[in-house]
């Protein structure tokens, strides 16, 4: 049922926002790999890590005017976003994928994937919230 709903979102050109663990939600679905832009397998995580977030594309509407920042979040040891993904945020944490946030197209839908957002230590960060807000607006075609 979920797979059918997601497939229909792409056909209806509805925006898709995937936050934190949602990126890894269906690792055995080939269609999910098409939506997120890589094989969503991971080999480990660690909660409460300090992550220095870097801006990969300072000209994208989601990241325009955003400066690099640090936040406390959960790290994921997983693959980086793949071909067809437009990388927005990165980090060099040794226990995390290099890619933190990216956009892509899935059929007619704009997709925004943002690995961050584990708990309140991340959510209190105003830059994290602003990037997420802009990501939602971007998927809706409003910026």
What are the roles of these predicted feature ranges?
Residues 1-26:
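Short alpha-beta junction capping motif
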Residues 24-35:
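Glycine-rich, charge-decorated loop segments at or immediately adjacent to ligand/cofactor-binding or catalytic sites
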Residues 96, 106-143:
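Extracellular ligand-binding/catalytic regions of CAZymes and related secreted enzymes
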């Amino acid at each position: 049922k979920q797979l059918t709903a997601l497939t229909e979102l792409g056909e209806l050109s509805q925006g898709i926002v995937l936050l934190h663990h949602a990126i890894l939600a269906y690792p055995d679905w080939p269609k999910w790999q098409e939506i997120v832009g890589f094989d969503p397998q991971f080999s480990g995580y660690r909660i409460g890590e300090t992550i220095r977030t870097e801006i990969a594309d300072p000209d994208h509407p989601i990241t325009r005017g955003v400066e690099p920042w640090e936040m406390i979040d959960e790290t994921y040891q997983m693959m980086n976003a793949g071909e067809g993904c437009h990388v927005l945020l990165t980090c060099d944490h040794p226990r995390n994928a290099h890619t933190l946030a990216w956009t892509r197209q899935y059929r007619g839908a704009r997709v925004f994937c943002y690995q961050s957002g584990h708990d309140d230590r991340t959510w209190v960060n105003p830059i994290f919230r602003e990037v997420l807000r802009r990501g939602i607006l971007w998927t809706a075609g409003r910026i």
